[in-house]
């Protein structure tokens, strides 16, 4: 029933490596202070597993609506289609050639893993696993940025050193906001529009849309979780409930992207919301083993 009430305080986590020092905390605070309440966003980079291309195109629709994709159609469609880079065609050996270091918003719909030495994001094809993007790429970003990932364990950081996971590499360098799951994430491979998204796909789509509408990161995350009340008369499936509790916002929850829209504010939602229609009931794990 928490979403019946207005949330006056929004929280974000600050992940610290096991070998972190006060300088790491101070470094993030200095970078956040340079973006006093707002950071400009002008270019987005998206990368997806081939299996999830349809869903990823729907999730990333807010980028197209705000004209944030570069749209380089000269690339082979096996590598780049629907404004997204596609893995496993884009994998470790070539990702440096396409990864946009000058972007300020990154979206990844790839696999993750809880294996201690598996710290990248991965693509899966014919029962083979391919390293799609590594912590080194995120650490090479040149501008203050936002990262959103649907990967399983995309938000893992405990017992790792500086830069050893995607989260620590990003937040230890130029990333100010990071949204990711601490455990298994669930999503679907097919989608015809944002209306039929569910689980991690819906959460990330709404979060990115609300950020780009001018809400703070904390408000956008709260509203993304609220959105699950739009279906099934306010009752959750097990996967929806897991999505709500396992995704975490890292960074300053009071930061917002671009110009804050007049009157933008998160409001409480009635628990018994009218169902708007069926959602995609097929769910898949976003993990590799």
Feature locations, PLM:
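Cysteine-dependent hydrolase recognition
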Residues: 1-289
């Amino acid at each position: 029933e928490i979403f019946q009430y207005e949330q006056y305080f929004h929280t974000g986590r600050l992940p610290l490596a096991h070998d972190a020092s006060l300088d790491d905390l101070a470094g993030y605070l200095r970078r956040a202070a340079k973006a006093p309440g707002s950071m400009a966003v002008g270019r987005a980079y998206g990368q997806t597993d081939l299996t999830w291309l349809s869903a990823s195109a729907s999730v990333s629709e807010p980028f197209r609506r705000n004209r944030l994709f570069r749209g380089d159609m000269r690339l082979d469609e096996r590598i780049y289609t629907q404004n997204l880079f596609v893995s496993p065609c884009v994998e470790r050996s070539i990702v440096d050639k396409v990864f946009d270091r000058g972007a300020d918003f990154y979206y990844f719909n790839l696999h993750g893993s809880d294996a201690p030495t598996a710290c990248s994001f991965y693509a899966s094809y014919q029962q083979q696993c391919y390293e799609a993007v590594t912590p080194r790429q995120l650490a090479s970003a040149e501008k203050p940025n936002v990262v959103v990932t649907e990967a399983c364990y995309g938000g893992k950081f405990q017992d790792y050193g500086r830069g050893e996971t995607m989260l620590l590499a990003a937040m230890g360098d130029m990333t100010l906001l990071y949204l990711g799951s601490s455990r298994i994430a669930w999503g679907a491979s097919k989608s015809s529009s944002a209306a039929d998204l569910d689980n991690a796909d819906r959460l990330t789509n709404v979060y990115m849309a609300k950020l780009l509408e001018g809400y703070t990161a904390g408000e956008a995350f709260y509203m993304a979780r609220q959105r699950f009340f739009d279906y099934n008369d306010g009752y959750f499936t097990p996967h929806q409930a897991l999505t709500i509790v396992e995704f975490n916002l890292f960074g300053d929850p009071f930061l917002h992207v671009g110009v804050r829209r007049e009157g933008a504010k998160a409001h409480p939602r009635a628990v018994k919301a009218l169902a708007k229609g069926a959602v995609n009931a097929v769910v898949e794990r976003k993990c590799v083993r």
